[in-house]
Amino acid sequence: MPQKTSKRFKKALEMVEPGKSYSVVEAAELLGKFPKAKFDESVEIAFKMTIDPRKTDQMIRGTVRLPNGSGKEVKVLVFAKDGEAANAAKEAGAEFVGFEEYIEKVTSGWTGFDVAVATPEAMAEVRKLGRVLGPRGLMPNPKTGTVTDDTAKAVKEVKAGRVEYKLDKGANIQVLAGKVSFTADQIAENANTIIDEIIKAKPSAAKGRYIENCVLSSTMSPVSYTHLTLPTKA
């Protein structure tokens, strides 16, 4: 049975020029003109890559700090045995800090947090939580700065708008770029920062064209139609 298309979606679709590649600023301005949902929609930038996620030398993963923040309230869990690291994490604003009690909670399936940070000492036990954390992308990782003794720095960076990017099995990368309530300039600045970071992360094994296409969208916008014009180096 054909899926119904809402009037709001149809109206947004009418505002998109078929076949056009938008500059980042144009796309950000367009998102601001779309009919609004009843909530503050997230803005996301999505990349279709030409690299092969099955090859370890073409896998990319990292973090990027958004100049205007992500607009998302992030709940942070810090696994820390050491009192000093735990106290520093609490002072930095982490919602959940501890070790054994949170190992037990997560083992039972609890995932009431958005980002997990762990000290290197704690990782021997945290790794055993892979069944719960892994599928949700919550496992602490040195590449994303979430395995560290400097728990205060990690918490502050996450709270300030550091977001993670990772190539998935379908050779896609999706990154949070802000909220619809942001100004077009704020969204564009965040999006350009992400684009620059993805380009810098190009593996040396990747030859030729690196990014097949790129789309900027909000939660309820016509995602397939707001393609971006990318730098030639992409």
Task: Kindly give the residue locations of the regions a language model identified.
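Residue-level signature of catalytic and energy-coupling elements of molecular machines
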Residues: 27, 89, 134, 216
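Flexible, glycine/charged-enriched surface loops at secondary-structure junctions
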Residues: 39-43, 201-213
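Translation machinery proteins
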Residues: 24-87
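Long, charge-patterned amphipathic alpha-helical coiled-coil/hairpin "stalk" segments used as oligomerization
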Residues: 95-199
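Conserved small/polar residues in nucleotide/adenosyl-binding loops
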Residues: 226-232
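Flexible glycine-/small-residue-rich
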Residues: 47, 80, 119-120, 177-179, ...
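Generic N-terminal amphipathic, Lys/Arg-enriched alpha-helix
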Residues: 4-17
